[in-house]
A protein has these predicted regions:
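Alpha-helical structural signal in soluble globular domains
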Residues: 39, 128-136, 154, 158, ...
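Charged helix-capping and loop-helix junction motifs
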Residues: 122-128, 175, 203-207, 237-242, ...
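Auxiliary Fe-S-binding modules of radical SAM enzymes
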Residues: 1-31, 211-339
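Core AdoMet radical
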Residues: 76-96, 100-177, 181, 186-196, ...
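Glycine-rich, proline-tolerant flexible connector loops at the mouths of alpha/beta enzymes
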Residues: 23, 55-58, 81-82, 109-122, ...
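Catalytic cores of alpha/beta
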Residues: 148-157, 197-210, 266-278
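Conserved hydrophobic beta-strand within the GNAT/NAT acetyltransferase core sheet
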Residues: 56, 140-143, 190, 258-262
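N-terminal pre-triad scaffold of radical SAM enzymes
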Residues: 35-78, 85-109
Length: 339
């Protein structure tokens, strides 16, 4: 049994893959990338089956960055860079959630930015929106920067399922907050961003932090290679390096949801389907954190072509029968409980 196979079996048995082993795996993958991707796919299927989770999202606050942030993740973690323009109404957000459900999303994330819940009006607005989203039949998530234990408990009480937060470099305050959120009974999705000048060792260290935090899901964001707002410190990652990063995360976080988010379309390009083969079991659909639109039907088509199953299917029929008859491209909407 060679190194890749041994590490795959170790991961499937939920024995921690060390940071040194993860780095060696990455080096091994530069010479045998498809073997590493195939092994990561086996780990994904062992823990997640053939299900692929789709997520929708909206920005509650329409804003712009004054410092040319390299990604939406850094944009929302730097409140001094943000110039707020408009707050969406509860009705607008609910309409977007309903549309996300129609697009096959299982989860719907509201992103407010770091300043999102610092006013009573904003807090009241969120506490009204979350129950409404729940009633619509899609699972509500929230990304609103730093919150305390009392706020986490209140969000849980009004029906929030998952809190999303981007992991910063130092991470001390982030880790404390994520633990408080988990203690309140909320699921935690931690975001990480790559392509901002970090080394691969730093990516592995991020995975190690997330493993210690025992988060439920990880959203992977990549600096958008098609964006004009890139700082000098940003780097362009090749599709294969991104795939190897996803694969190593699957080895280190074998039973967690791993979601491809910001920059997935422009950075992975024609290799986007391999992001799932590399170990991802979740996708941001409709749009992503870099605001590059991708038709949700393309995601469903891609999932079907891979022989996998979206947790909420949509009708892909585009023939002239307009739904009156079932065709080979048509599928019934299916909802499944996922927590």
């Amino acid at each position: 049994m060679d190194f890749i196979e041994k590490l795959k079996e170790k991961s499937i048995k939920k024995k921690n893959v060390s940071t040194s082993e993860a780095l060696e795996l990455f080096v091994e993958g530069t010479g045998n990338p498809y073997r590493v991707l195939a092994a990561a796919s086996e780990i994904r299927e062992h823990f997640k089956g053939k299900d692929i989770i789709l997520c929708g999202m909206t920005h509650l606050i329409s804003a712009k960055c004054t410092q040319e942030c390299t990604s939406r993740a850094s944009f929302h973690s730097n409140p001094d860079h943000v110039s707020a323009q408009k707050i969406k109404t509860a009705r607008q957000v609910l309409a977007e959630a309903v549309q996300a459900k129609k697009n096959g999303a299982e989860f719907f994330s509201i992103i407010t930015g770091s300043e999102g819940l610092k006013t009573k009006k904003a807090w009241k607005n969120i506490c009204q929106i979350i129950p409404a989203i729940n009633k619509s039949g899609i699972k509500p998530c929230l990304a609103a920067g730093m919150i305390d234990a009392n706020q986490a408990a209140q969000l849980k009480a009004v029906g929030l399922l998952r809190y999303c937060h981007h992991l910063q470099n130092d991470g001390k305050e982030d880790r404390a907050m994520m633990n408080a959120v988990k203690a309140a009974g909320l699921s935690v999705c931690a975001g990480v961003s790559f392509g901002i000048g970090e080394t691969f060792t730093q990516r592995i260290q991020s995975a190690e932090v997330l493993r210690k935090l025992n988060v439920d899901a990880v959203s992977i964001n990549m600096i958008d290679s098609g964006s004009e707002n890139k700082r000098d410190r940003a780097q362009t990652l090749s599709p294969m390096e991104i795939l190897m990063t996803v694969a190593v995360f699957r080895f280190m976080l074998p039973d967690k949801d791993i979601k491809l988010c910001g920059g997935r379309k422009n950075n992975l390009r024609q290799l986007l389907p391999l992001g799932i083969i590399a170990g991802a079991n979740s996708l941001m659909t409709g749009n992503d954190l870099n605001a590059t639109e991708r038709n949700s039907k393309l995601d469903h088509e891609m999932i079907a072509d891979l022989g996998l199953i979206p947790t909420r299917e949509i009708d892909l029929c585009t023939c002239d029968t307009k739904g009156k008859q079932r065709c080979a491209a048509s599928s019934a909407i299916k909802s499944r409980s996922l927590v």
